[in-house]
């Protein structure tokens, strides 16, 4: 819109952007309750909603400057990329399309440049955000600043794990990943920064003959689950948009909104009205949330690679296994944020396969200070997928890395045998450990803490049962129990997620099953009791006062 070859790197484009934003902010810098969203659902380039090079001269020059700063010795760069040495001053091209594909190495160059390109893109965008923030603050504005990112920002696009220091709150737009809505909230939250589900709602899903798949009641139930889960690690949600969207030209976006074109209400309107009432009752208590006892650590080395979708699958399965099945609240920490992780009672590194040295060092520092770390599968590759010897370095002798080539496996954890099944992708791309004394969970002392190491990439086995059993065993070993006592029988597909606040405990309860569930529990913090019928596919919430265990606000029952 403002011209230029590259929105983030062309000096003329950046100058115009800065002038536009400064001019608008100057006019409205004292308006209360106004926030600045610098860009909506950003991609790094002209290739919308994917991470690909733009291919312009500004990008190429910036890419080479970034490489020179990261790798002053070109020999180290050649080694990292498995390429012939290219002397100083020579221009290095950005990655080709084939390098982003799973089997690109069969037809073109390897994909080892991807990790650096992803980091370059993240650093470049973070710098752009930093500069615009400075321009806004120069006007005297103290209004909140954010970036409205969608779920792709937690896959392979621009991530608040990098630009987070330059915004006042992070966001996610929970549109499509309806089976990973808890993950949506957890990955958007960055250490020390508030998070909001800034856009949520229902886009139309149709059958092959162009009939809407969901009924209005289905839509309302899904919206209810999305709104409820926005209170996990977050400060709520905004439905985009709350009224009607009839002037959109996109067929799947026209139906968005709680009102129809004739201004009659959909069932979603009742959800919004009731949610607003509940939020008004609890807002004074939504302060000083205690961090979860368990932190799931991502691998950006794997996520910024050609097999990135497998790392995303591992994260989502880890979240579901821990929170839904093992009933343990968790947080998710990006690899480059591990230094800000704090002191959870357990950190889980799920099926990473590869990991940057800096992340590994930060995890070991956490363990040596008394932390517990669970690792599943080998992590014997660095950020460029070169072999390293991390297991031996921490005392795990006799562990050999082998390609995972089997469908079925068994792993012994104390007196229990955990069965695992691996599909085609796992058999094609993953490594596993062979321990010299059998396939069992290893426990290693490191400083004041402990490392638990499982031989298989458990989170990339089919289903979440294997990971949940492993997690439960480790929880028991370190004396970690769920923050509530469940009196009713556990039910698959039901999430019970408590957050301990300054004066209360907030319970978010979500059903993703086909039958109602009679839920009964005792909260360990307040000794308060919850007893309700959770309808199939719906959500409920309750705020329990710490001092006497009474329910001071509730939704859905």
What residue spans do the PLM features occupy?
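Soluble or luminal CAZymes and related metallo-dependent hydrolases
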Residues: 9-20, 59, 69, 117-128, ...
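Loop/turn elements at helix/coil->beta-strand transitions in domains of secreted/extracellular proteins
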Residues: 29-35, 72-73, 140-144, 167-168, ...
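Short beta-alpha junction loops
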Residues: 42, 201, 243-246, 378-383
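Hydrophobic targeting/anchoring helices
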Residues: 148, 154-318, 405-417, 430, ...
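A short, well-structured beta->alpha microelement
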Residues: 150-159, 320-341
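Short, well-ordered secondary-structure micro-motifs within conserved domains or adaptor modules
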Residues: 171, 342-353
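A conserved amphipathic helix/loop scaffold
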Residues: 219, 350-557
């Amino acid at each position: 819109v403002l011209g230029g070859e590259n929105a983030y790197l062309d000096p003329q484009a950046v100058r115009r952007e800065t002038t536009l934003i400064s001019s608008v902010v100057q006019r409205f810098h004292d308006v209360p309750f106004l926030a600045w969203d610098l860009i909506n659902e950003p991609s790094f380039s002209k290739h919308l909603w994917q991470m690909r090079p733009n291919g312009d001269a500004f990008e190429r020059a910036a890419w080479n400057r970034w490489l020179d700063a990261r790798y002053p010795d070109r020999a180290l760069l050649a080694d990292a990329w498995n390429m012939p040495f290219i002397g100083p001053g020579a221009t290095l091209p950005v990655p080709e399309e084939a390098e982003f594909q799973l089997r690109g190495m069969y037809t073109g160059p390897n994909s080892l440049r991807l990790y650096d390109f992803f980091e370059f893109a993240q650093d470049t965008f973070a710098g752009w955000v930093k500069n615009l923030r400075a321009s806004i603050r120069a006007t005297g504005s103290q209004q909140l600043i954010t970036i409205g990112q969608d779920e792709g920002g937690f896959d392979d696009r621009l991530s608040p794990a990098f630009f987070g220091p330059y915004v006042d709150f992070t966001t996610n737009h929970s549109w499509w990943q309806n089976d990973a809505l808890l993950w949506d909230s957890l990955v958007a939250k960055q250490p020390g920064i508030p998070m909001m589900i800034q856009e949520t709602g229902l886009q139309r899903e149709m059958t092959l003959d162009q009939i809407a798949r969901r009924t209005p009641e289905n839509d309302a139930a899904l919206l209810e689950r999305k709104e409820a889960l926005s209170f996990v690690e977050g400060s709520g949600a905004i439905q985009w948009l709350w009224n009607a969207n009839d002037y959109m030209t996109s067929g799947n976006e026209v139906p968005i909104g709680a009102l129809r074109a004739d201004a009659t209400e959909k069932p979603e309107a009742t959800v919004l009205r009731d949610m607003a009432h509940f939020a008004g009752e609890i807002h004074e208590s939504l302060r000083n949330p205690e961090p979860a006892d368990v932190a799931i650590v991502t691998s950006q080395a794997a996520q910024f690679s050609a097999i990135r979708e497998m790392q995303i699958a591992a994260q989502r399965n880890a979240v579901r296994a821990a929170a839904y099945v093992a009933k343990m609240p968790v947080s998710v920490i990006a690899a480059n944020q591990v230094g800000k992780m704090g002191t959870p009672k357990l950190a889980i590194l799920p099926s990473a396969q590869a990991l940057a040295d800096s992340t590994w060092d930060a995890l070991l520092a956490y363990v040596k200070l008394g932390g517990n770390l669970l690792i599943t599968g080998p992590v014997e590759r660095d950020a460029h997928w070169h072999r390293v010897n991390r297991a031996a370095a921490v005392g795990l002798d006799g562990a050999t890395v082998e390609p995972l080539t089997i469908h079925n496996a068994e792993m012994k954890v104390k007196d229990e045998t955990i069965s695992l099944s691996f599909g085609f992708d796992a058999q094609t791309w993953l490594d596993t450990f062979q321990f010299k004394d059998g396939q069992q969970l290893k426990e290693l002392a490191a400083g004041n803490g402990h490392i638990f190491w499982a031989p298989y990439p458990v989170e990339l086995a089919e289903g979440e049962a294997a990971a949940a059993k492993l997690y439960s065993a480790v929880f028991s070993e370190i004396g970690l129990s769920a923050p509530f006592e469940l009196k009713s029988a556990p039910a698959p597909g039901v999430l019970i997620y408590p957050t301990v606040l300054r004066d209360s405990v907030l319970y978010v309860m979500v059903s993703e099953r086909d039958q109602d569930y009679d839920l009964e529990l005792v909260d360990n913090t307040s000794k308060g009791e919850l007893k309700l019928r959770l309808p199939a596919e719906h959500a409920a919430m309750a705020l329990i006062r710490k001092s006497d265990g009474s329910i001071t606000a509730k939704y859905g029952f």
